[in-house]
């Protein structure tokens, strides 16, 4: 049986990018505040929301959040009542009643105004609670020492920055990570690359999976757990932990984690819906064999990927007039492809892009 009694989270995040999108809210953080009775939980974001959930909803004995930014001069705490003129109780109420935009514009505007003056991590970050408040109000352990955080940990969640930073950080603490420890990536590094990173450091013993939110954690309660790298019982344990902590959990083949969870999920959703409706139109209505249908779909996907790679995403219309497909794909406009309106809408979009290219 896999037991997860101590979780170390590396990296605390910064809310500036969340404010910049103009769409994210604190819906999940406010739900956690409501469920736990800890009002300050509503003011958490990024991995801090994770920490509260794991401690108070999943019942993990010890949750440690580590980031050198906690000691940085640029660590900036925004007081939503004094700085943004938003009452905390009203903030929570608005989110729970489904009206987050009654309060969110003031937070976004304030953070966007100060963002240029606050250094980016690790020299600075924007939060709504101080490290002391995180410890006192949220009952989690806060540290700037990654080695201390991972000591005796059963699971490590990496909320570290994107790019080539993660290997350099993990190299410093690789010998401090317990044997057989579960290590989970989030949205800043692909699971495959995460696993290869540890293999390159001689740590084949580590159980690699993911704890990917597919959005910012304070906005929506969900987590995606990668299959295919860690032992099945480990994946199951992390999945069950995620269900308790985040409210909703999904198991996803590790190689699909990025396409399902990152920005290109918008592309994946369209492609997946197309595959499902194309399959049913061909097999159920035309009576085509599934292997024949699959081969046709595979060729379409592979050749479109090749087309984009060879021509460039910004030059697609120059290489192939989108209207070309409006005169071919319309012959498949029946059954599920038509009933769901996926193909008619696609043809409409292609026609618009064809006219834009003229």
Swiss-Prot record:
EC number(s) reported in the record: 1.12.98.2
Instruction: Quote the InterPro entries the UniProt record gives.
Output: 6-PGluconate_DH-like_C_sf, HMD, HMD_C, HMD_C_sf, HMD_N, METHMP_Hmd, NAD(P)-bd_dom_sf
Residues of the signal sequence? none
Thermal response of activity: Thermolabile at 90 degrees Celsius.
Q: Which domain of life is it from?
A: Archaea
Q: In which pathway does it act?
A: One-carbon metabolism; methanogenesis from CO(2); 5,10-methylene-5,6,7,8-tetrahydromethanopterin from 5,10-methenyl-5,6,7,8-tetrahydromethanopterin (hydrogen route): step 1/1
Q: Which SUPFAM superfamilies match?
A: 6-phosphogluconate dehydrogenase C-terminal domain-like, NAD(P)-binding Rossmann-fold domains
EC main group? oxidoreductase
Write down the Pfam families for this protein, in alphabetical order. HMD, HMD_N
Q: Can you supply a Gene Ontology BP term from the record? A: one-carbon metabolic process
What are the protein's UniProt keywords? Methanogenesis, One-carbon metabolism, Oxidoreductase
Q: Which reaction does it catalyse?
A: 5,10-methenyl-5,6,7,8-tetrahydromethanopterin + H2 = 5,10-methylenetetrahydromethanopterin + H(+)
Q: Which GO terms describe its molecular function?
A: N5,N10-methenyltetrahydromethanopterin hydrogenase activity
Q: Which family does it belong to?
A: Belongs to the HMD family.
Protein name per the record? 5,10-methenyltetrahydromethanopterin hydrogenase
Taxonomic lineage from the root:
Archaea, Methanobacteriati, Methanobacteriota, Methanomada group, Methanopyri
């Amino acid at each position: 049986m896999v037991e997860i009694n101590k979780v170390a989270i590396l990296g605390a995040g910064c809310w500036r990018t969340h404010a910049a999108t103009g769409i994210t809210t604190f819906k999940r953080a406010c739900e956690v505040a409501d469920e736990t009775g800890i009002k300050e939980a509503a003011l958490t974001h990024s991995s801090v929301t994770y920490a509260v959930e794991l401690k108070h909803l999943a019942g993990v004995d010890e949750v440690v959040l580590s980031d050198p930014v906690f000691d940085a001069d640029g660590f900036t705490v925004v007081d939503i009542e004094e700085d943004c003129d938003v009452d905390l109780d009203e903030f929570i109420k608005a989110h729970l009643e489904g009206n987050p935009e009654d309060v969110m514009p003031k937070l976004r505007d304030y953070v966007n105004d100060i963002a240029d003056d606050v250094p980016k991590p690790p020299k600075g970050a924007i939060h709504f609670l101080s490290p002391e408040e995180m410890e006192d109000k949220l009952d989690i352990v806060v540290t700037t020492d990654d080695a201390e955080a991972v000591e005796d940990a059963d699971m490590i969640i990496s909320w570290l920055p994107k790019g080539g930073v993660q290997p350099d950080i993990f190299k410093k603490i690789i010998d401090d990570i317990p044997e057989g420890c579960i290590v989970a990536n989030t949205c800043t590094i692909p699971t495959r690359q995460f696993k290869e990173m540890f293999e390159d450091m001689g740590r084949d013993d580590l159980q690699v999976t993911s704890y990917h939110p597919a959005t910012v954690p304070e906005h929506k309660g969900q987590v995606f757990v990668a299959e295919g790298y860690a032992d099945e019982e480990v994946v199951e344990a992390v999945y069950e932990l995620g269900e308790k902590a985040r409210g909703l959990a999904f198991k996803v083949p590790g190689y699909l984690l990025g396409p399902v969870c990152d920005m290109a999920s918008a592309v994946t959703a369209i492609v997946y819906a197309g595959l499902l409706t194309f399959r049913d139109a061909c097999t159920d209505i035309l009576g085509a064999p599934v292997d024949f249908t699959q081969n046709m779909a595979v060729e379409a996907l592979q050749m479109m990927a090749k087309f984009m790679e060879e021509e460039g995403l910004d030059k697609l219309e120059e290489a192939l007039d989108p209207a070309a497909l409006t005169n071919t794909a319309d012959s498949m406009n029946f059954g599920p492809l038509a009933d769901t309106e996926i193909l008619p809408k696609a043809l409409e979009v292609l026609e618009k892009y064809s006219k834009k290219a003229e």
